[in-house]
Amino acid sequence: MKRFFKMALFLGVSALYGQQGGMWIPSLLEGMNAKEMKTLGMKMTVADIYSVNKSSLKDAAPHFNGGCSSEVISDKGLLLTNHHCGYGQIQAHSTLQNDYLANGFWAKSLAEELPNKNLKVTFMVRIDDVTKQVLKGTESITDETEKAKLIEKNIAEVIKTAPKEAWQENSVKAFYDGNQYILFVTETFKDVRLVGAPPSSIGKFGSDTDNWVWPRHTGDFSLFRIYADKNNRPAEYSKDNVPYKPKHFFPISLKGVKEGDFVLVFGYPGTTQEYLPSAAVAQIENVINPARIGIRDIVLKVQDSYMRKDQGIKIKYAAKYARVANYWKKWMGETKGLKKSGAVALKQQQEAKFQQAIQKANKQAQYGNLLSDFNRLYKEIEPYTLAANLNSEFIFRNIDLLSNGSRLLQLEKALEDKGEQSFNDRKKNLLNTFKEIFKDNDKQVDKDVFEKVVVFYAANMPKNLLINSLKNFDAKKLADNLYNNSFLTSLSGVESVLNLSAAEFKERMKNDVGIQFVRELKEMNDTQVFPVYDRLNTQIHALQRTYMKAILEFSKPSDRIFPDANGTLRVTYGKVAGFSPADAVTYSAHTTLDGVMEKYVPGDYEFDVPQHLRDLQAKKDFGRYGDKNGKMPLCFLSTCHTTGGNSGSPAIDANGNLIGLNFDRVWEGTMSDIHYDPKLCRNIMVDIRYVLFVIDKYAGAGHLVNEMKLIK
């Protein structure tokens, strides 16, 4: 009877989560995952993917600089990641004389490889479950703050006492909303040098227009090399360091991929929220995303109107516009995908079955109020969540005058709380920050953005959380007053204030109209919004942990219950597949270089194509990298479940060979962070044959290909 109840309870959960998708812990693949991967065509064993006793795939897939993924592709530490992951390093080495962003860069020897300050890659050494140690003593604690303090203390003890080598690091991460804790032993290499990068017209082809979009034709890759000391251990940069000898590196397949082929993606996905209740998903779909999209829509339209008329403004605002557009586009795709897949309704169906099964299993005392409590708390937090997101977009992100004011108010607080020494210590760094900000600032553009966004902000902010200055106001008069009279609108104005004594600084801050406006916004945010938001969010987090506990308690080993992404090493797998996002629209899983020429716009910053690449295409001079049909493969799709952080992840075939490089998702499937739908969710990879073609045939850097192990 007990077995029946457990299965009955999980019928509802399994219906929602029991489908392809998932981001799996590589040390825990035995059982359901192993069987499923074999069914999909995998020839490897799980020990080939993760092992502490022998070399395995994990030893060739390091975390790239804390935000991307990467893969080792030679026995000399040659490292492959995305162009957009290495963009900052490529940019840092670029000058007017040597513009590597525009023209590309290819080191002809080890001596020409370029060091990068603060760049690091981190390898996974060992993964251990430490849940019992971390949760020890917490069972009887009901106060969430006290429980969190003890957990932090226990984690610190685990990190301190877990065995490791002197050059390695220990860290502990929470899984399943705090129902499981895992120790990661890692080693970090800090001498990582730039080896090669295609020009942006290849590495960023399509830029903002093609971002999140299929069909895709972006050669999104760059090459680095890991260096180590003479003992092959991590070391700070030194000219005496030597190329790292990896425990494992990926052989590269030239065989290509076809529809239905097995694909495994190994990397470090950042954040997902797959187990949110329907109330939370509805709030994202109907409240949070529309607010964020609404503000950014205004920002982008204003900036674009100026960028189209003025080349100087276009240059200043190009990177800023791209940053704003990135998640604006993602949130729109996410919202559309949630609606199209009926995510809220599916969650509600699952919750109804969940509630019925709890009653049958006589679990009302433990779990009977979960869903009603979720509904109550999400309704209660909604105005504060809306306010917090509006404030984030309005005060801190999209308007320089307001974000500059916020920074100076933080400096003022440091002066009040920590004294003049702290004030003086922070001024220099803040001044450097302002120099960077004003380098790409235009006062009139910022004013116009403010004047239009403030109207949307005031109209959508809950009235009890709206500052008095924005009740019955004239947007044009307000903008004129702030931008004509505040020192926040120019670098010289900000510099003059930062050069004042502490006493003079405080007085000047009191009398500036811009500072006073930002102060009013921040005081409302800090005293009325966040205290309530944090209190309710703490309750929701505790409830989510209990909800996750119930899901785990009633799941079977064969159920597809994977932990949300949290920046740790994960395996996701699927198959090469196209998709149909709308009526009468069906996409193939592959693109070729032909598509680059179809999109080519001479001189365009997004769709220009280098002459040499056009020549190679015209001659069909693809070398050994073209396919049997005489085409040059470029990108392909699969059903692998990825998110931010998977950029640069290796795409691996059934035998453990590298076949591609993950770099994006399709727009229609970006809701996979919240709800994975196998019909719509696809990850986008650049075909490894195109990577090799660009390195060898386009750049003439065949010496790098010679380092690699090619499988024909």
Swiss-Prot record:
Q: InterPro entries of this UniProt entry?
A: Pep_S46, Peptidase_S1_PA, Peptidase_S1_PA_chymotrypsin
Gene3D superfamilies the UniProt entry points to: Trypsin-like serine proteases
One GO MF annotation is: serine-type aminopeptidase activity
Look up keyword Protease and say if it applies. yes
Q: Which UniProt keywords apply?
A: Aminopeptidase, Hydrolase, Protease, Serine protease, Signal
Q: Does the keyword Hydrolase feature in the UniProt annotation?
A: yes
Question: Top enzyme class of this protein?
Answer: hydrolase
Q: Where is the active site?
A: H84 (charge relay system), D220 (charge relay system), S647 (charge relay system)
Its ancestry begins with:
Bacteria, Pseudomonadati, Bacteroidota, Flavobacteriia, Flavobacteriales
Biological source species: Capnocytophaga gingivalis
- Its name, as the record gives it, is Asp/Glu-specific dipeptidyl-peptidase
- Site feature location: Is essential for the Asp/Glu P1 specificity of DPP11: R665
Task: Give the family, as the similarity comment puts it.
Answer: Belongs to the peptidase S46 family.
One BP term from GO = proteolysis
**Where does the signal peptide begin and end?**
1-18
